[in-house]
Amino acid sequence: MAITDWPEEQRPRERLIRHGAAILSDAELLAVFLRVGVTGKSAVDLGRDMVAHFGSLNGLFSATLNDFSKINGLGPAKYAQLQAVLELARRSLCEELQAGVALNSPQAVKQYLQLLLSGRAYESFVILFLDVKNRLIVCDEMFRGTLTHTSVYPREIVKAALGHNAASVILAHNHPSGTPEPSAADQTLTQALKQALMLIDVRVLDHFVVAGKQVYSFAEQGQL
């Protein structure tokens, strides 16, 4: 049955307008995005198929066009729409950080890094360079590695911090394995970067490890 044949109070779009997006399930939110289903399936059914196929929203958001198009009813047009929505969300959070709330809103930093890093099939090391008022200057993906390892060079980070005239930085990388706890190597690297940046009067405010929906904060755990 098409969603247009459902009782109005059960239709995802109408429920969103009346009660807000937070009450909708993942499949219902995707149905609003999709607008229509395919033969024999409503948009909600198709939304459920998408979540089941990719295992999670993070898996869906990081899917390639080829993988995305394997689901009947999905193709380049919907893929482009989804990527545009994700990029708008990233830019919205980036604007919030640039407004000078990096320290006052650690949750915004976490959300931004989750959007940026979760779902990647390789390790990526990014740095948020901040000015003296804790406003974001730039977020730079400085190093990219494999499924289990990324080579990070402190000298390059020091050079970048000087180049951006940064007063402080926030470090972040992802764990494609899905486990957010930092390794011994992560802890050693964090301290090495802290010491190297201290020599040029740049503070390390935090180091986040992103693993899907989980984010580990070195600062929150008292490891800085």
From Swiss-Prot:
Entry keyword Protease: yes
InterPro entries documented for this protein: MPN, RadC_JAB, RuvA_2-like, UPF0758, UPF0758_CS, UPF0758_N
Gene3D superfamilies: 5' to 3' exonuclease, C-terminal subdomain, Cytidine Deaminase, domain 2
Signal peptide interval: none
Any one Gene Ontology molecular-function term assigned to this protein's record: metallopeptidase activity
Occurrences of domain MPN (ranges): 102-224
Annotated Zn(2+) binding sites: 173, 175, 186
GO biological process: proteolysis
Alphabetical UniProt keywords: Hydrolase, Metal-binding, Metalloprotease, Protease, Zinc
Residue numbers covered by motif JAMM motif: 173-186
Domain of life: Bacteria
Cystine pairings recorded for this chain: none
Signal recorded as keyword: no
PANTHER family membership: DNA REPAIR PROTEIN RADC, UPF0758 PROTEIN YEES-RELATED
NCBIfam families associated with the record: PRK00024.1, radc
Assigned protein family: Belongs to the UPF0758 family.
Protein name according to UniProt: UPF0758 protein HEAR2468
Organism: Herminiimonas arsenicoxydans
Biological classification of the source: Bacteria, Pseudomonadati, Pseudomonadota, Betaproteobacteria, Burkholderiales
